[in-house]
């Protein structure tokens, strides 16, 4: 009998924290499957999920205010360990008989907590030991309220000068609460704390590994698809590439990929996709050269949102036209990943985390009367990358910087023209090439060039040149929700600028974008 990699599972209830997905990713990194659900998850569904432990995540509300979110009573009736983080600790305290109040001294950012209670959760975990033997942890705080009275059967776990009950525990029931965030990297021992809860206290086994995920996905694809044929839109991005590799391994020639070349790709990207999948792996790939169709449809349009819609509609038209030439296709594969399928405004109350769901190829499944196969729908992006390596995809492909679905169409400000796309492609290639040479490519999270439809005077040799302006953009981020502009060395920027201006006749000036997110976004459009 095949191993059930979902057998040991953790339930995470979301109260609206920006860090909730990070908790889920940390649990998965430990090697244990988990799911993220809104705080008002149906009680029957909680029992049916049968978790080996529950994590109550943080949130922006105040427990002592009317109609603030509460944890379903079923969680406390399951008889499994419960770990409350920030708001999760506060609602646990309130619901089990304690008290939460607003605090005049709010804690946001780094803090040191003293570990004052001996519990299974923090036993042997510390950053400091004082001369008097007191254990301390360096943590990340983000709270305005605090627990002022614990439930009767709890003990103080940790404290700070402004928050005497910064952690509480009941070892007998395996209930734990901390006011800090163990899921963020700023809490140095956060990974060990979560591992202690998930592996030791909940008793989970580390069944969720890339090799086992690959085996499970391949078995599920074969069971779902049988002998039917599958169609996949291959973009060359990480998600669709991993889906292609996974499907090819599972069903071989039953898979046909359509690669739509829209004329808005990176330099040599089309050739690289064909070489990797068609030539090296033997995947059936149809390349649809549709540059003229995309550029004609985009002609005269400068509005970013309208450009995105035109590109999306044109993709569907081209993909549909190519798929109509194929016989006996029953399934459409998509590179949908877990953040895509977390319900939009998932809580019945509308107070939980809101993430827009999406379909990678619009309404195609309905229009073409195809059934969907989505082998990555349980995985976060970092898990998709690790799965790609497990399947033998090259590191540089799997860890390539993100590229927007509309491609260069949203990196050319205003109207898209072939001339602009050709110039931008070459400039972007130079930037990425120099980042790799200087060993900076994997130090930044995303880097690209933006084409600005304005001209600037330059001097080349004895002559003046009136040509286009481009901007370099490089950012560092963990989650892409916030990002800092990358502090690249001046020498590197000088090399990139010099090469672009000297090698590309149509560009006379190079600028560097020093805007962080927020207030700016990472992409310009």
From Swiss-Prot:
Q: Which InterPro entries match?
A: Class_I_gatase-like (IPR029062), GATASE (IPR017926), GMP_synth_C (IPR001674), GMP_synth_GATase (IPR004739), GMP_synthase (IPR022955), GMPS_ATP_PPase_dom (IPR025777), NAD/GMP_synthase (IPR022310), Rossmann-like_a/b/a_fold (IPR014729)
Q: What class of enzyme is it?
A: ligase
Q: Provide the reaction this enzyme catalyses.
A: XMP + L-glutamine + ATP + H2O = GMP + L-glutamate + AMP + diphosphate + 2 H(+)
Query: Any signal peptide, and if so, which residues?
Result: none
- Write one Gene Ontology MF term: ATP binding
Q: What's one GO-annotated cellular component?
A: cytosol
**Enzyme Commission number, as recorded:** 6.3.5.2
Question: SUPFAM superfamilies recorded for this chain?
Answer: Adenine nucleotide alpha hydrolases-like, Class I glutamine amidotransferase-like, GMP synthetase C-terminal dimerisation domain
Q: Where is the active site?
A: 86 (nucleophile), 181, 183
Question: Where do the GMPS ATP-PPase domain residues begin and end?
Answer: 208-400
Q: Please name every pair of cysteines joined by a disulfide bond in this record.
A: none
Q: Which Pfam families match?
A: GATase, GMP_synt_C, NAD_synthase
User: Which residues take part in binding ATP?
Assistant: 235-241
Pathway membership, UniProt: Purine metabolism; GMP biosynthesis; GMP from XMP (L-Gln route): step 1/1
Q: How does it assemble?
A: Homodimer.
Q: What does this protein do?
A: Catalyzes the synthesis of GMP from XMP.
User: What name goes with this protein?
Assistant: GMP synthase [glutamine-hydrolyzing]
Q: What is the lineage of its organism?
A: Bacteria, Pseudomonadati, Pseudomonadota, Gammaproteobacteria, Pseudomonadales
